């Protein structure tokens, strides 16, 4: 979990650094740089993908649950982030689908119930609907 939390903290730090480099009028009328286009977002995506594919998360159901719980709650745990960061925190949830298969059914069911309440249907992105469906299927394997 320390490594996962470290990924998020490093991402937030990179975003802050990118924000400091922006000029006051950047992004105005589509001119100049925009924080949403900063390379730190792609780097975070790749780092999280590598973490989920290359660590013990898939081999330990307990670690899988902790990692998914953290990733799914991150948009709520960091409410004061830039909008581009918020959307990235939602988008990376799609990377978690292979890890869901490693969950114990009861853990998948618990995450499913929480996720369904935390992300109302009218506010969900398509990737979140996919995550929810995968959690539901894994929870029924009991």
Where are these regions (language model features)?
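Non-catalytic all-alpha helical scaffold/repeat segments
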Residues: 1-142
